[in-house]
């Protein structure tokens, strides 16, 4: 069955264009118009993705090393691709409408001229955007609800310090229950979420999952499915996985403590909880994360937090 033509889906799903062509041939004029609109939105999503890529490249010189790793760039690329797809699906840029209006203007339809004029005005608004303001645009799209809630989207934390200050009370409580340093939990949450900027989102907003704990068979609560990066034989691979969703950040910290205490594979690591380095390397070896440098990264972030 053909996908809903109003659903742009994943930006690189170019094979769907052949389905649009077949639909146009089989269903006559109505199918042709429907396919035209869908193809225009596909083109707009690709154009928008290219524009966002240019913005990111223009802004690279202003980014710190800790927020500009390969993992960060990978998730940022996924965010931009999904943003481009969603903006096109919602008609937010107006480029698709302008394309359709131009291609149908010869039919003498006054509505086409109006749509073309409105779309042109909308497109001009975006062409005037300064590439250096990419982050501000991204934030505004999230606040206005234009950005997909199923993607990794920035949260309210505007700096590493604000993330640490907000999470510190929860981390201290969880660290006491677990018997580890609060700074270690803060570091792990910071690494997993990019200082709170990449918390997995669900239909209601944030999943509040600070430790990216997946929703396995034992999980009976809410969950959200999204793309993630896993390492196989030290090679990063994009995968789709279900993650746990919580009502608030406190629940996320509480579940992290339960997750480690109730899982036998972390028993050896928990016996070394008095030594932060041994503990984080222990849960890493036990399979908490597939990134081969995960423990080293957590410890580096921990040092940064302790120097704040």
From Swiss-Prot:
It is found in: Periplasm. Its main location: periplasm. GO terms for molecular function: amidase activity; hydrolase activity, acting on glycosyl bonds. Residues 159-308 are annotated as: Catalytic. SMART domains: LYZ2 (SM00047). One of its GO terms (biological process) is bacterial-type flagellum assembly. It comes from the Bacteria. This is Peptidoglycan hydrolase FlgJ. It comes from Vibrio parahaemolyticus serotype O3:K6 (strain RIMD 2210633).
């Amino acid at each position: 069955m053909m996908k809903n033509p109003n659903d742009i889906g994943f930006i690189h799903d170019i094979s769907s264009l052949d389905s649009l062509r077949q639909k146009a041939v089989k269903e006559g004029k109505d199918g042709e118009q429907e396919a035209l609109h869908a193809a225009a939105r596909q083109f707009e999503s690709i154009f928008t993705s290219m524009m966002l890529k240019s913005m990111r490249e223009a802004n690279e010189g202003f980014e710190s090393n800790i927020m500009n790793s390969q993992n960060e760039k990978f998730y940022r690329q996924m965010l931009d691709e999904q943003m481009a797809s969603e903006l096109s699906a919602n008609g937010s840029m107006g480029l698709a409408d302008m394309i359709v209006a131009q291609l149908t203007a010869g039919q003498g339809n006054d509505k086409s001229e109006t749509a073309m004029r409105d779309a042109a005005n909308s497109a001009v608004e975006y062409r005037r955007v300064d590439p250096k303001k990419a982050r501000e645009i991204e934030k505004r799209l999230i606040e206005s609800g234009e950005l997909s809630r199923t993607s990794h989207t920035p949260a309210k934390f505007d700096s590493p310090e604000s993330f640490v200050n907000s999470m510190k009370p929860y981390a201290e409580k969880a660290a006491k229950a677990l018997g580890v340093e609060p700074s270690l939990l803060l570091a792990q949450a910071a690494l997993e979420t990019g200082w709170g900027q990449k918390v997995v989102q669900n239909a209601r907003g944030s999943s509040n999952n600070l430790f990216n704990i997946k929703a396995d068979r034992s999980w009976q609560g809410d969950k959200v499915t999204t793309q993630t990066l896993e390492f196989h034989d030290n090679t990063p691979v994009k995968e789709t996985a279900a993650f746990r969703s919580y009502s608030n950040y406190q629940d996320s910290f509480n579940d992290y403590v339960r997750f480690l205490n109730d899982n036998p594979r972390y028993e050896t690591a928990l016996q070394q909880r008095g030594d932060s380095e041994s503990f984080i390397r222990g849960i890493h070896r036990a399979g908490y994360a597939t990134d081969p440098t995960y423990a080293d990264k957590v410890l580096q972030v921990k040092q940064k937090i302790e120097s704040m």
